Every structure is written in C-alpha cells, then in structure tokens.
C-alpha cells in the first residue's frame, strides 16, 4: 500500500515534501509526532513557528483527501523546529508536534484548591493556563466535592495526570486538519470504532508478505504479561475521628497491595477509587505490542485489541 503525506503550515511551502514521520500515541498518553520535511527554501523562519499549530495529513492517494477511512490527520503545536542539513538543492527541516496541553509540563506551581471536585480542579488548571476549553471534552463523573486538593511544587501536567490516574479516568485525542480535541472519560464505551473494517488481519513474524495489504493489517505481534496484585486495601486516619480510622478494600486473593495513608477523608472517597486502584495494580497485566499498516488503527482507541498496540510508520 502506497501512502502520501503532507505537512500543513502557513510558513512551509506547499510544494514541500514529507521525508519521514514518527508518531507515538495511545490511551492516556500525550501524542508525540516527529516530521521531517524537505523544501527548496533555506531560510524558513523557525523561531516564529514555535508554539504555532500545524497538521500532518497521511493517507492513500488513490482516495479523496476527505475520505476518513483512507486519510487521517495529526494536529498539534510545534514545540521543536530545526534545520537539519542540505539535501542537494533542497533543505531538510525537522518539526515536533505535541498536544496543546503538553505546555502544562513547563508550569510548576504550588497551590490549594478548596471545596471543589477533582474535575472542577482540572478545569480550573486548564483555564488558568489559557487552554481553549472548546478543545476539551469531559465525559466522566465529577466525583465528590473535596475539602482541599493540594498541588505542591508540581507541574500542572503531572498534577492533572496524577489525579486522572487516581480516579481511573483516561483520555485520548481526536484530530482534524485545523485542531485537536482532548477527550476525558471514565467510560469504556465512549470511543468510536476505527474507520473501515472492524477487524484487521494478523500476520505472524514469519509471514514473508510482511502483513502489508490495501486494507491494512497487524504484524509482528507479541504477547507480554507482568505480575501485580489481585487485592487492594487502604487505611487512613482523621484527627476529627481518631477512634474511627478510614478504610477501603477491593478484590480477592493473596497478592495484596496495602496503602497507608490512603489520603482520603471519608470511606466513600476511598471506596470511589477502589475499582481504578485495583485495576491499576492487577495481578496480571497483558499487552500485545505490534506494528500495523492500517492508517485508521491509530486514529483512536476503538479497535478490538484489549492491550496497547504501538503503531509506527
């Protein structure tokens, strides 16, 4: 299958050619896209391009660019831009695209939020950082209101991801030619399926065809697993009720993970985090790393694989 790729930015000539793309993305992972472009202009204003947005268009040139089954976009903010080297009469440039929320990694603060749910806290963090809230979609239970939530000498990105992980909330990104949207959800069925066939053919490592077809396929798949815990228990102490310690537990089995202090004020707060903590510390953690030739496979997390499948071009 032949693929075509284009780099879309006002400062890059339209006749510029995409030489290579390296993209990594996944559930609850900030996408990271490296693009190398060649063009005849030796003097692109790279400094002015930093923090501006760009898009990579990738797909099958045999179909219209408006066909979502055969074309996809990766849209993001340019965090790095550099001149690489001359290439004959052309010039090589490299650009790195990241989501707009990745800028929170450079904002380290200490503050206390009072009488707010965790989702309210995350909304405030995003709004204070100047993130366009139209590019953030929340589809999750806000949870109980907390007396206080503390951010202590912590980047706003780590602070936000820490609380999302604590509550079992995941996120992913949806891309178009002009923007990208961050979806934050605690529901397993909120993803759209991949475009085209709902299932992809899997080829073994020994397949001489390499698993390449016009419909796309998955190849070089391996299975890995890690041992964790099958039971979680936690306790905490509150000075207001010293004779009534807080406690919560989940799961059954002998491989217990015990946490003290649990950092929750009521049994209900501890209980609300039980399912996510138990899944996070699950005794068996399977994954199926592999490679794919399907353009739509890495569009979102809606494929039928129950593990993580890194897709590389």
What kind of feature is each model-predicted range?
Residues 1-313:
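Amphipathic alpha-helical and helix-coil boundary elements used as assembly
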